[in-house]
A protein has these predicted regions:
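Conserved N-terminal helix/loop that builds the PLP phosphate-binding region
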Residues: 2-30, 140
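Conserved core of the PLP fold type I
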Residues: 26-27, 31-165
Length: 165
């Protein structure tokens, strides 16, 4: 078992995408050749697409690579060393910091917060995801800095009660 990694059947479902683009001109979006690194915050076309889906502005979207765990690590690391946009100081300078960890969950995510010294607070998981009554109570504590939210494989869904909480 490889915790959250797609199986061969799931990968095979998207194999046809590898042959969709056959002309290099199809690899240019808003003047950017997408075969190269592109823009740091993501391609403009992708930001417009997801802004429409999410009901926000394109400039509020960050489009990263396909390695969600890497993006999560980078975000926690940056907050730890520099703080977040509304932080008074970097999280490493705080007297205490906690992270909500729905359990059962993914050990790789938990290892990130463990390695930065967070107190990991277990949140029970129901058939619909983390127990939101517990989450809503725990986030009243200003030391709580985040919660691990992981999509359900194989359908890549999440529950509206957490997304809109």
């Amino acid at each position: 078992m490889a915790r959250g990694k797609p199986g061969k059947a799931q990968l095979d479902m998207v194999s046809d995408m590898l042959s969709i683009l056959t002309d290099p001109k199809d690899c240019v979006s808003d003047g950017t050749d997408v075969r190269n690194y592109g823009e740091l915050s993501g391609l403009s076309a992708a930001k417009r697409l997801f802004a429409d889906i999410l009901g926000c502005k394109p400039e509020e979207c960050f489009i990263g690579g396909n390695a969600g765990l890497t993006l999560m690590y980078d975000t926690v690391s940056k907050a730890y060393t520099h703080g977040m946009i509304h932080s008074e100081k970097p999280w490493c300078k705080l007297d205490g910091a906690k992270w909500l960890c729905p359990s059962p969950g993914y050990d790789r995510h938990f290892k990130i917060t463990e390695s930065f010294g967070f107190d990991m607070v277990i949140v029970p998981v129901t058939k619909n995801g983390p127990d939101m009554d517990v989450v809503e109570e725990l986030v009243k504590d200003p030391e709580v800095k985040g919660v691990w939210c992981v999509l359900t494989v194989p359908f890549l869904t999440y529950f509206a009660s957490l997304v809109w909480a």
